[in-house]
Curated annotation (Swiss-Prot):
The keyword Coiled coil does not apply. This is Large ribosomal subunit protein bL34. GO terms for molecular function: structural constituent of ribosome. Residues 23-44 are annotated as: Disordered. PROSITE patterns: RIBOSOMAL_L34. It comes from Marinomonas sp. (strain MWYL1). Keywords: Ribonucleoprotein, Ribosomal protein. InterPro entries: Ribosomal_bL34, Ribosomal_bL34_CS. NCBIfam families: rpmH_bact (TIGR01030). HAMAP family: Ribosomal_bL34. The gene is rpmH. The keyword DNA-binding does not apply. Residues 31-44 have a biased composition (Basic residues).
């Protein structure tokens, strides 16, 4: 059986990176929530 998690830095950054988050309204809200919460890491 194939494992479901096949790590790739490129895919990770494209889907969950800072620039990907900032590209959409919802993504910007995610960053804002994480800032408000005081997260050390805002995105992947």
């Amino acid at each position: 059986m194939k494992r479901t998690f096949q790590p790739s830095v490129l895919k990770r950054k494209r889907n969950h990176g800072f620039r990907a988050r900032m590209a959409t309204k919802g993504g910007r809200q995610v960053i804002a929530r994480r800032r408000a919460r005081g997260r050390k890491v805002l995105s992947a």
